[in-house]
Amino acid sequence: MWPAYFVVAPGRKRVPSLLLSTAARDPWKPYPVPRFEPFAAIRYATDDLASLVAPPYDVLSDADIDVLKARSPHNIVRIDVPRGGEDRYVLAAKTMRAWLNDGILTMDSEPSFTVYRMRFTDSTGVRRDIAGVLGGLEVVDAEAGGVLPHERTTAAASTDRLDLTRATAANLSPVWGLSLAGGLTELLAEPGEAVGAVIDEGVEHLAERVTDQERIAAIHQRLASDDVLIADGHHRYGVARMYRDETREATGRSDTPAELTLAFVNELIEDQLSVAAIHRLYTGIEIADLADALGRSFELIATERPNSKSLATLQQEGFLILVGRDAAWQMRAKPGRFDGVRPLDGGWLETALADIPLTVSYQHGLDATLSEVDSGHASAAVLIRPVSVAEIERTAREGLLMPPKSTFFRPKLKTGFVIRSLT
């Protein structure tokens, strides 16, 4: 097992943290940073993966799953999103074993890291080349530090992911982490051995295996020098913690593969992140009442319903947009109303509507959000601005938490490039 490191990064500010504990922490005390280790990956035997990989399970509709299953009898959704009754997890595990026995899936003969690149043009016309690394990220206790959430999470109502992990004894889809260690992007610039490429919806996804021991050590040591912030996959990481605890109780050991979980980690810097907003949908309240409630905290100016171009312009000017079926308003915070509140649209809305009886849900994408309002599924929506990368870094550095569903990281990682065995 690779060694663990305990450091305080130069210039790192440690403060009492709403994130980790209500108790004050010694700002000069060294806290553990997580291990990040290579492993012998399970991969498809072919590098022609277009019909085999899939988006993450939590963004797939039933129709999406049908389309993916129709592409190939070996598409990863047949394991990652099993259908059926109570035996569906057992069937998923049997399918995975059968694919391994039949050579559809193969396990590498030695531990490796996998460099994962996503190349695309974002919604602003900027060319992006996001480079991260797939490996085994240490599963730490909720208050231990090292692996940090960046937003409050809603309670998971289903045990689906834990049941699937128990049955398959595998990590099927990665957590997305952001490393606060500088220089990771430069370290990943050199290509590795190509093991798969897919182009989907304008995004080129590439996977490259790294087995060179010096390069593995360099990546490991760089990631061992600072914290990792969870960008996407808070629930998956929580499931990994539950599975680790079950394994410890069953085996009496703390050195099994369950001590780590599959993660993609890239550097927390501006050119390595593409962050979109997750808009707010409101039900249980009439649009007039919602406008009245928001009008106590925001200046509301009647406007036309925005399109993608006008929304971007309004957001750059500092506006949020309240949208109903037949009306829309520009919203600008009243002077002094949110003094002492972090400059996050989601937090401002929570503060403004704290005493108003309503239900809030979340939707990314302008068209999908407006569709929810037009269909009557929501009374109204508030279109919010994307969170800045600087504010995400502040969240990590100061041990803070954003409101739920504050960030939507794009593009979504594909499931199926790499599977990590837990046996």
Regions found by a protein language model. Give the residues of each.
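Surface-exposed, charge/polar-rich loops and edge strands
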Residues: 18-423
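Cationic, low-complexity basic patches in intrinsically disordered or flexible, solvent-exposed regions
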Residues: 14
